[in-house]
Amino acid sequence: MADLSLELCGVKLKNPIIAASGTFGFGREYDELYDIGQLGGISVKGLSLKPRTGNPPSRIAETPSGMLNSVGLQNPGVDSFVENDLPWLLEKNVAVIANITGTSVDEYVQMAERLAPTGVHMLEMNISCPNVHEGGVAFGVKPESVYQITKAVKAAARQPLIVKLTPNVSDITENALAAQEAGADAISMINTLTGIAVDVRRRKMILANNTGGLSGPAVRPVALRMVWQSAQKVHIPIIGMGGIETGEDAAAFMLCGAQAVMVGTANFTDPFACPRIIRELNDYCDAQKVQNVQELVGTLKAY
């Protein structure tokens, strides 16, 4: 058996497999199927200051090798999470990552302040949200805005801050560097790629919001490339994600430079995906005679 444990931003994880935000709720449904305490961590459903009802249906569309979602960050609000879900989660002996969203820098700062005195282990800041003060342009598109929001939230946060980067940019490494320079403790990538689904018979969009976020195996080659490129530029930890379905997929991200990975869409197609991937990653390490999984990180060779 390989040693899968690691320390991420000062937080000890049993293994590098983390359930991705938006695909795992607050963990309760999955805990009915298996002990979620065996995971490395859980990034909970995206939280906002106030409850959000999300977008109208339809909100999900299946695509070849993936799915489009336009859920709209439906959630009960941060206060409800802290009062009703966090105490239960903290009993599960798993690293809890609070994924935070907002419509302004001030909202993100308030989220960090609200979560500061809680037992949450890390914050993951979703900066793919539109900035209402900048004409609706997402925070994560421009390096300048990535730097600004990261610096402000880092000043308010007590927990390590992970900045989740959008792939919908020309050069993701610029935003990775901006996050690092502003004080981010780690970056996670990639968030979903923007796409649409078309009903050709009705000649209509399938999603009520028109556009949605593409995830699943279809995005994996793009995600691997972006992790690999960013690992050449930054020295803070990278958490890789994008279409991970197997232990070898997880290993590929680590070879590209990720210290840990997040599993998202696979949780929908196989509710037991996370524990299975942990086993498969261990099997891969044993076959490769790797004693500690962190030996894989950044060892990808050029052709």
What do the predicted segments below correspond to?
Residues 214-235, 239, 245-303:
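Alpha/beta catalytic cores of nucleotide-metabolism and tRNA/nucleoside-modifying enzymes
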Residues 11-14, 91-96, 156-161, 232-236, ...:
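Short, surface-exposed connector motifs at secondary-structure boundaries
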Residues 4, 17-20, 40-44, 96-100, ...:
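Hydrophobic faces of well-ordered beta-strands that scaffold small-molecule active sites
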Residues 1-96, 101-102:
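N-terminal capping/small domains of soluble enzymes
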Residues 51-55, 197-199, 271-274:
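Short, charged, surface-exposed secondary-structure boundary motifs
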Residues 32, 57, 103-239, 247-252, ...:
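Alpha/beta enzyme core
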Residues 93, 119, 154-157, 281-289:
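Structural signal for hydrophobic packing residues in well-ordered secondary-structure cores
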Residues 22, 47, 128-130, 192, ...:
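Flexible loop residues that form catalytic
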